[in-house]
Amino acid sequence: MLAGCYPRPGDLLTRVLATGTFDILHPGHVYFLTQARALGDELFVIIARDSNVTHKPKPIVPEEQRLEMVNALGTVDKALLGSEKDMFEPLKEIRPDIIVLGYDQHFDIELLEEELTKRGLPAKVVRVPLSKECPLCSTGAIIKAVLKRYG
């Protein structure tokens, strides 16, 4: 069912979509994806392309490797690389019912829902609050710890 163009006609499953860079996979990512999965029956994940990451330092882990890691998680039905040109392009194929944002993804939910509706993609957008706390629950914290130890 997850091959090709991700069929939707007549299906009663709730399809959830999460997006992110997922550089240096950590428990915060796992928490986010587990919370996203709990909102529906299928979880698709779009991995940010290396070339599109402009709001923070470029990923350390190459996009193909990040894709492989996320696809290996049991909570994820299908992970795929995003479009380098149009962030809405893969959504046209996936046609999610719910789009889940992380606490650190700086999208305005109302504006995003408006843009989705304009494109014939009336998905509900929700944000997962930060709830997983651990010393190394962010890529930045992991990098700082490595530099401190081996710097």
Curated annotation (Swiss-Prot):
<keyword id="KW-0274">FAD</keyword>
<dbReference type="GO" id="GO:0003919">
    <property type="term" value="F:FMN adenylyltransferase activity"/>
</dbReference>
<comment type="similarity">
    <text>Belongs to the archaeal FAD synthase family.</text>
</comment>
<comment type="function">
    <text>Catalyzes the transfer of the AMP portion of ATP to flavin mononucleotide (FMN) to produce flavin adenine dinucleotide (FAD) coenzyme.</text>
</comment>
<dbReference type="GO" id="GO:0005524">
    <property type="term" value="F:ATP binding"/>
</dbReference>
<feature type="binding site">
    <location>
        <begin position="21"/>
        <end position="22"/>
    </location>
    <ligand>
        <name>ATP</name>
    </ligand>
</feature>
<keyword id="KW-0808">Transferase</keyword>
<keyword id="KW-0288">FMN</keyword>
<dbReference type="InterPro" id="IPR024902">
    <property type="entry name" value="FAD_synth_RibL"/>
</dbReference>
<feature type="binding site">
    <location>
        <begin position="26"/>
        <end position="29"/>
    </location>
    <ligand>
        <name>ATP</name>
    </ligand>
</feature>
<protein>
    <recommendedName>
        <fullName>FAD synthase</fullName>
        <ecNumber>2.7.7.2</ecNumber>
    </recommendedName>
</protein>
<dbReference type="Pfam" id="PF01467">
    <property type="entry name" value="CTP_transf_like"/>
</dbReference>
<dbReference type="InterPro" id="IPR050385">
    <property type="entry name" value="Archaeal_FAD_synthase"/>
</dbReference>
<dbReference type="GO" id="GO:0046444">
    <property type="term" value="P:FMN metabolic process"/>
</dbReference>
<keyword id="KW-0547">Nucleotide-binding</keyword>
<comment type="pathway">
    <text>Cofactor biosynthesis; FAD biosynthesis; FAD from FMN: step 1/1.</text>
</comment>
<comment type="subunit">
    <text>Homodimer.</text>
</comment>
<dbReference type="InterPro" id="IPR014729">
    <property type="entry name" value="Rossmann-like_a/b/a_fold"/>
</dbReference>
<keyword id="KW-0285">Flavoprotein</keyword>
<keyword id="KW-0548">Nucleotidyltransferase</keyword>
<dbReference type="GO" id="GO:0006747">
    <property type="term" value="P:FAD biosynthetic process"/>
</dbReference>
<dbReference type="InterPro" id="IPR004821">
    <property type="entry name" value="Cyt_trans-like"/>
</dbReference>
<feature type="binding site">
    <location>
        <position position="104"/>
    </location>
    <ligand>
        <name>ATP</name>
    </ligand>
</feature>
<keyword id="KW-0067">ATP-binding</keyword>
